[in-house]
């Protein structure tokens, strides 16, 4: 029995389609083969040292180069030495559930013994009339709890502001300092674990060009708080370049308490 094939004109009709199909497949495969493989982001080259730089925030936990930590310690020492020549105004504001509860001001300066001195300015805020009875007792207890929390918060902040060079050194020697590059060769954050108390983290954001501190981020356990508290410190600079903590902000959402501390009005301290 004789097989019947496709008419020649049918073959001529489908030939370009078949050839096109194979050519298309070949082009796709060739393109895929030639496409460059994805490569990780290139790390930035070190500026002046032989220590490798970290180029992305994904490098959290990488040991901090000794040069960076040394620069941080020197910056802290330099700023603190210069600030001992100044006096300034400190304004502390305590808030509860969005309402300002107290505002105090103090003139601050370093005494001859090297300790920070604070002299209250103005009258102490007047306390509200006490309520009597069971309700008054509840309010009184609540007020005492909040007052105690505020005192603990203030004490916690003092452990980190300003940073202490000797504690930075201790963290470095314990191998608990790490670095994250926020902006290659411009900004980095050095995280100091177990800086003041076990379980805390002091993050110091630095300008790598000037080696000045830009900000602090702190997470620390605190007496009277079930959860660790967090607060941020923004730094500014005097005309001579000396860095100082311009504003500290603690927001304890657990109890609705906020603490704001602002430093301003720096001037050379008058000595007798």
PLM features: residue spans?
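N-terminal secretory signal peptides that target proteins for export/translocation
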Residues: 1-12
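Bacterial N-terminal signal peptides
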Residues: 14-26
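N-terminal leader/targeting segments and the immediate start of mature chains
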Residues: 28-89
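Intrinsically disordered, low-complexity boundary segments flanking structured domains
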Residues: 72-80, 92-95, 164-167, 176-178, ...
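Solvent-exposed N-terminal domain segments of exported/luminal and surface proteins
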Residues: 76-137
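Flexible, processing/modification-adjacent segments and terminal tails
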Residues: 124-200, 220-225
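Gly/Pro-enriched, hydrophobic low-complexity segments
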Residues: 181-272
């Amino acid at each position: 029995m004789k097989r019947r094939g496709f008419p020649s004109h049918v073959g001529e009709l489908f030939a370009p389609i078949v050839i096109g199909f194979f050519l298309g497949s070949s082009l796709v495969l060739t393109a895929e083969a030639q496409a460059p493989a994805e490569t990780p982001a290139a790390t930035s080259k070190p500026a002046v040292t032989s220590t490798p730089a970290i180029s992305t925030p994904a490098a959290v936990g990488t040991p901090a180069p000794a040069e960076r930590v040394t620069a941080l310690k020197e910056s802290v020492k330099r700023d603190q030495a210069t600030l001992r020549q100044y006096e300034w105004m400190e304004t502390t504001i305590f808030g509860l559930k969005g309402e300002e509860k107290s505002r105090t001001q103090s003139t601050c300066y370093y005494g001859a013994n090297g300790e920070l001195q604070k002299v209250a300015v103005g009258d102490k805020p007047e306390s509200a009339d006490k309520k009597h009875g069971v309700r008054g007792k509840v309010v009184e207890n609540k007020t005492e709890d909040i007052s105690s929390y505020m005192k603990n918060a203030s004490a916690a902040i003092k452990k980190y502001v300003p940073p202490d060079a000797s504690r930075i050194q201790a963290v470095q020697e314990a191998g608990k300092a790490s670095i994250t590059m926020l902006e290659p060769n411009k900004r980095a954050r050095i995280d100091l674990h177990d800086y003041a108390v076990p379980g805390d983290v002091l993050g110091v954001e630095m300008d790598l060009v000037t080696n000045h501190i830009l900000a602090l981020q702190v997470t620390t356990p605190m007496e009277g708080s079930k959860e660790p508290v967090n607060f941020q410190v923004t730094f500014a600079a005097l005309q001579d370049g000396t860095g100082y903590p311009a504003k500290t902000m603690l927001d304890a959402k657990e109890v609705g308490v906020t603490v704001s501390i602002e430093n301003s009005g720096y001037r050379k301290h008058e000595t007798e």
